[in-house]
Amino acid sequence: MPWGFFQSHFPYTIFYMKNDCPCGSAMPKFILTVEGCLRIGMVHLHSELVMPGDEPIGGGFFDVDYISNRLILYRQSHDYGVPRWHLVETLRVPKDYRGYTIKYIYDDGWHEDYNVSDSLPIEYYDDKDNN
């Protein structure tokens, strides 16, 4: 299949050809925990983002739009499924993303995009604290 097919059908997906990824095979992934903690990182597996005591309730991939200050979350984790936003009361986001609008894109043909920033109160945490 031509490369343009993937770019047009999967606009929010980052595809790397073999040996092109700057981090080996790590990808930009996130998980959501039942405590409302959004964990973000360049990892091989979503499970690498889980800290002791965490209970993941979904995950997926992310992209950062630096021009419009948006954190775009999309797709789903094979390990933890689609993020279950309805179980979260307050979202805790790494402080590096303060001021960013957060949006989750379902892209399944059934759900509308979920504007996380407008739907949940957001607190920020220092990523070094690991909580």
Predicted regions mapped to residue ranges:
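Eukaryotic phosphoinositide-binding membrane-targeting regions
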Residues: 1-131
